[in-house]
Structures are given as structure tokens and as C-alpha cells.
């Protein structure tokens, strides 16, 4: 079991460890699992970069930073998070001096290319607008958080529709400005969404 855990952690394409964690809980009822290996799995399952071990290799550090990023992104779905906030949460400010913007963008792009994050980079405001992020561990607490976020989103949409029906000038102006915005404003710089769609069709050429 220890080998299976290590292989999953070191697999560059694996970012969700909940099923493996649950499997380990069942296996432990009949045979012990090395506590250090199990603790490492728990960190990759629901921990963040603050839990990293100094004994790990660089690849494990990078993966845990990506997982930390999507945790942060999940708290900002439908809104934006600053590069500065990402820099601190991923502890990138503790790395040797380099261009912080480049470093933050590197992790964002890695998350997007691995299809665990969908969003837009605004180069002008140095922010990431989050559309979607992978859920790492779904328990009752996380489900309650998601319900709360969904309720807030529905409330915001209802308020916008109410203002539109009322013909609120400020909303009309915002929509007019939005229609004039283009990629030159930095809004549509870097958009990745490779998730499969139910209506996707393969064509043989």
C-alpha cells in the first residue's frame, strides 16, 4: 500500500487523493500502513504548503503549491484574488529572489494546463479571476461552505436582475463599459478551460 501511495503522490497527473485516503482507512483495519507515508498522503489529500516536509523533493513541493493554489481559488470562485495573496499563500515570498509576477503566473498556468483551475489572468491589475477550481476533499464542512457560496452567488444575481428591471443607471453604465472592454484591458489574457463538455463531438478527418 505504501508503494501505491508514493506512486500516486509522485504522479504528475494526480491531484485528487480523497478516494485513496478512504481506501487506506479501510486497509488499516486489516493491515498497518507506515505512519509517515500515511501522514504524507493526508497532507496531499487536504493539507497545504505549510505542512510540507523539508525532506521532500522539489516536485512534491511544486505539487503541494498547486494544491494550495486551488484551495485558495475555491474560496474566490466567481471573484478575483490578487497575485500578492497567491504569493503569500503559496509561500513563494520565501523562495530565492526572482520576479514575483512571473513565479505566480507560472503556478497559475501550471494549474490551468493540468485542468485543475479555470480562470482569467488580468495582467493590468495583477489579479486572477477564478471561474472554477478542483475540489480536493468533499466533507460535510466543505459542502456547507459550497452551499453558502452558492447562496451568496444567487443573491448577487438576484440583486443585479432587480437593478436591471428597475433601470438603475449605475448598472446600465457598467454593462456599457463591459461591452467596450477587450483583451487590451487585460481581462481576457490567459483563459483556459479544457474540461470535457457533454456536447463535445469527435470528428474523424
UniProtKB/Swiss-Prot annotation:
GO terms for biological process: protein deneddylation. Residues 1-135 form the PCI domain. Pfam families: PCI (PF01399). Keywords: Phosphoprotein, Signalosome. The keyword Phosphoprotein applies. The keyword Nucleus does not apply. Signal peptide: none annotated. One of its GO terms (cellular component) is nucleus. The modification Phosphoserine is found at residue 183. Belongs to the CSN7/EIF3M family. CSN7 subfamily. Component of the COP9 signalosome (CSN) complex that acts as an regulator of the ubiquitin (Ubl) conjugation pathway by mediating the deneddylation of the cullin subunit of SCF-type E3 ubiquitin-protein ligase complexes. PANTHER family: COP9 SIGNALOSOME COMPLEX SUBUNIT 7 (PTHR15350:SF5), COP9 SIGNALOSOME COMPLEX SUBUNIT 7/DENDRITIC CELL PROTEIN GA17 (PTHR15350). Component of the COP9 signalosome (CSN) complex. This is COP9 signalosome complex subunit 7. It comes from Schizosaccharomyces pombe (strain 972 / ATCC 24843) (Fission yeast).
Amino acid at each position: 500500500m505504501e508503494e501505491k501511495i508514493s506512486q500516486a503522490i509522485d504522479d504528475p497527473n494526480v491531484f485528487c487523493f480523497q478516494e485513496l485516503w478512504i481506501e487506506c482507512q479501510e486497509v488499516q483495519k486489516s493491515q498497518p500502513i507506515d505512519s509517515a507515508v500515511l501522514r504524507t498522503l493526508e497532507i496531499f489529500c487536504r493539507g497545504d504548503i505549510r505542512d510540507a516536509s523539508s525532506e521532500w523533493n522539489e516536485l512534491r513541493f511544486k505539487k503541494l503549491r498547486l494544491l494550495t493554489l486551488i484551495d485558495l481559488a475555491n474560496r474566490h470562485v466567481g471573484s478575483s484574488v490578487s497575485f500578492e495573496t497567491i504569493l503569500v499563500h503559496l509561500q513563494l515570498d520565501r523562495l530565492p529572489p526572482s520576479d514575483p509576477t512571473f513565479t505566480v503566473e507560472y503556478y497559475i498556468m501550471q494549474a490551468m494546463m493540468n485542468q485543475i483551475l479555470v480562470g482569467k489572468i488580468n495582467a493590468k491589475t495583477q489579479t486572477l479571476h477564478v471561474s472554477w477550481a478542483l475540489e480536493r476533499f468533499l466533507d460535510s464542512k466543505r459542502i456547507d461552505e459550497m452551499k453558502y457560496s452558492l447562496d451568496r452567488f444567487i443573491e448577487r444575481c438576484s440583486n443585479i436582475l432587480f437593478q436591471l428591471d428597475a433601470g438603475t443607471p449605475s448598472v446600465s453604465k457598467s454593462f456599457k463599459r463591459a461591452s467596450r472592454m477587450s483583451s487590451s484591458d487585460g481581462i481576457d489574457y490567459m483563459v483556459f478551460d479544457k474540461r470535457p463538455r457533454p456536447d463535445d463531438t469527435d470528428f474523424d478527418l
